[in-house]
Design a protein with these regions (language model features):
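Conserved phosphate-binding/catalytic region of the ribokinase-like
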Residues: 1-11, 20-21, 163, 167-168, ...
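Glycine-rich phosphate/adenosyl-contacting loop at the front of the ribokinase-like
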Residues: 1-69, 76-87, 112, 287-302
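Hydrophobic beta-strand scaffold residues
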Residues: 66, 92, 176-177
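A glycine-rich helix N-cap at a beta->alpha junction
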Residues: 83-100
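Conserved phosphate-binding/catalytic loop of the ribokinase/pfkB sugar-kinase fold
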Residues: 93-97, 107-155
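Glycine/threonine-rich flexible loop motifs
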Residues: 150-160, 188, 218-219, 226-228
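Charged helix-capping and loop-helix junction motifs
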Residues: 157-164, 190-199
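Short beta-strand/loop segments at the ligand-binding rim of alpha/beta enzyme cores
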Residues: 172-181
């Protein structure tokens, strides 16, 4: 019988507040959100968001004993997050910082229009290496970290803090995974050298799981601009083919990426598996059989 699996989900957490817009609104945002206009909406959907809650609670529901490590403020929104996590018996590892505010997002999901997010990073911006309990992390099978692009300490100084975290966890023998988030083009995060940040951290990441748009914006911004032009206002993933994705996959491999899964929206997923030597290392770390991994690797090479 397989042993009971354990994990830590760390990084970004927030409260998502989504007002429900009634159908038939049309497709022009400026005709809906007009200055001085009162818009009748339905009840707000309020739930936790961010990698810590989304991935952490999902793993827990899949039967993995998961500890959450995120930071919130000592305020009404923070108390709401704790209440939700407590209902899942998952609040134990959370940090409450009286000097910080809780992160939240207002999600505008208007029928016929792509979603928009108003996001306040709050306590996520102050999350640091020292907030992690590495003694607890060393005991688990998997360490998952999410959304460094909206966590200031993770991207300033050329990503030094993020690299430091992954070096520490990787050295402890725990499997590691990293997820990204979209970047506001006008934000401080957009001014960072993300290609260099990823080049430094990826050798310590066993599983890298970015979206195709996040990835292209970070390591091939000129290509991303061309994609936007081709899409002409529609969903970028709808105009992509395998020939668009392969150059990014090759670049990731040259940057030291091991296993990576690129999320490509409705068209599907692109998975690139590391070589047999790396897979053997992961087997030794995790105790999982590599029979399926070896088969998948041969399929990738063929």
């Amino acid at each position: 019988m397989d042993k009971h699996r354990t994990a830590v989900a760390a990084g970004h957490i927030c409260l998502d507040i989504t007002p429900v817009f009634y159908g038939g609104r049309g497709t022009q945002m400026d005709k809906i959100l007009e200055p001085g206009k009162l818009i009748d909406v339905g009840a707000a959907d309020i739930h936790t968001g961010g990698a810590v809650a989304n991935t952490g609670l999902a793993m827990q529901k899949l039967g993995i004993d998961t500890k959450l490590m995120g930071k919130i403020g000592d305020d009404a929104l923070g108390k709401t997050i704790l209440s939700i996590l407590e209902s899942h018996h998952a609040a134990e590892g959370m940090i409450v910082d009286a000097d910080a505010t809780t992160s939240y997002s207002i999600v505008l999901a208007i029928p016929g229009i792509d979603r928009m997010f108003l996001h306040h990073p709050g306590a996520n911006h102050t999350f640091s290496y020292d907030d992690l309990d590495f003694a607890e992390i060393a005991k688990v099978d998997l360490f998952h970290f999410g959304y460094p692009p909206i966590m200031r300490n993770m991207y300033v100084n050329n990503g030094k803090e993020l690299v430091r975290i992954f070096q520490k966890v990787h050295k402890s023998g725990v499997l590691t995974s990293l997820d990204l988030a979209a970047i506001d083009p006008s934000s401080e995060a957009a001014q960072q050298n993300w290609e260099e940040i990823l080049r430094q951290v990826l050798p310590y990441v066993d599983f890298f799981v970015p979206s195709i748009e996040e990835l292209c914006m970070m390591i091939a911004p000129e290509t991303y601009a061309k994609w936007l032009e081709r899409a002409n206002g529609s969903d970028v993933t709808g105009i992509l083919s395998l020939s668009d994705i392969l150059p990014l996959a090759e670049k990731l491999r040259s940057m030291g990426a091991r296993n990576f899964l690129i999320k490509c929206g409705a068209p599907g997923l692109y998975y690139d598996m590391a070589n047999a030597e790396v897979q053997q290392e992961l087997e030794e770390k995790s105790g999982l059989s590599c029979r399926y991994q070896s088969y998948a690797y041969k399929r990738t090479e063929s």
